[in-house]
Amino acid sequence: MISDVLSDATTRMGKAVDAAKTDFSTVRTGRANPALFSSLLVAYYGTPTPLQQLASFQTPEARTLLITPYDRSALNDIEKALRDSDIGANPANDGNVIRVVMPELTEERRKEYVKIVHGKAEDARVSVRNVRRHAKEAIEKLVKDGDVGEDDGKRGEKDLDAATKKHIDQVDELLKNKEAELLGA
């Protein structure tokens, strides 16, 4: 019973870490990264469609991204969506592909992005702690109802705390890497 609670909590904590990883990948670092465009919606035949469903991405150089639409009639719609986005890139349409050159980040902008990343990391930590709180309540309920012994409950809470620490450490490691990437890029 406690193992089910721990297994579920560990899975949900892992999902929180994965969500943080995804969030971090959407923060610009000055390098061309297709993940920057993962949340960008293009008005394709009047329907908001994720850019990743409309085109393939290549990075021929560190700061250049080539976007090749599967349907060439979508070129202008994709270009318009890129121009209207807050990514800060200037797309160039040559009739076949869209070339996006990522501008260098200023020191001020880098520090702003570091603050954003810290906020996303804190959100992930809170998410992990919430999972821990719910799992701890479930373990306490099992002990209170007499389904498991008090020793097993304490052992389960100790294992839960270890899993929580492990997942928060993973978020901190992701944060450290992203911060180094932002400030060192």
Swiss-Prot record:
This chain's protein is named Ribosome-recycling factor
Q: Which gene encodes it?
A: frr
- Membrane spanning stretches: none
Question: Keywords in UniProt for this one?
Answer: Cytoplasm, Protein biosynthesis
Lineage of producing organism: Bacteria, Bacillati, Actinomycetota, Actinomycetes, Micrococcales
Q: Which GO terms describe its molecular function?
A: ribosomal large subunit binding
For this protein, the record's InterPro entries field holds: Ribosome_recyc_fac (IPR002661), Ribosome_recyc_fac_dom (IPR023584), RRF_sf (IPR036191)
Matches recorded under NCBIfam families? frr (TIGR00496)
This molecule's function is given as: Responsible for the release of ribosomes from messenger RNA at the termination of protein biosynthesis. May increase the efficiency of translation by recycling ribosomes from one round of translation to another.
Subcellular locations according to the entry? Cytoplasm
Instruction: Enumerate the Gene Ontology biological process terms.
Output: translational termination
Assigned GO CC terms = cytoplasm
Highest rank taxon of the organism: Bacteria
Cytoplasm: is it a keyword of this entry? yes
Main subcellular localization, coarse class?
cytoplasm
Family as reported in the entry's similarity comment:
Belongs to the RRF family.
Which Pfam families does this entry report, sorted A to Z? RRF (PF01765)
Organism, scientific name: Kocuria rhizophila (strain ATCC 9341 / DSM 348 / NBRC 103217 / DC2201)
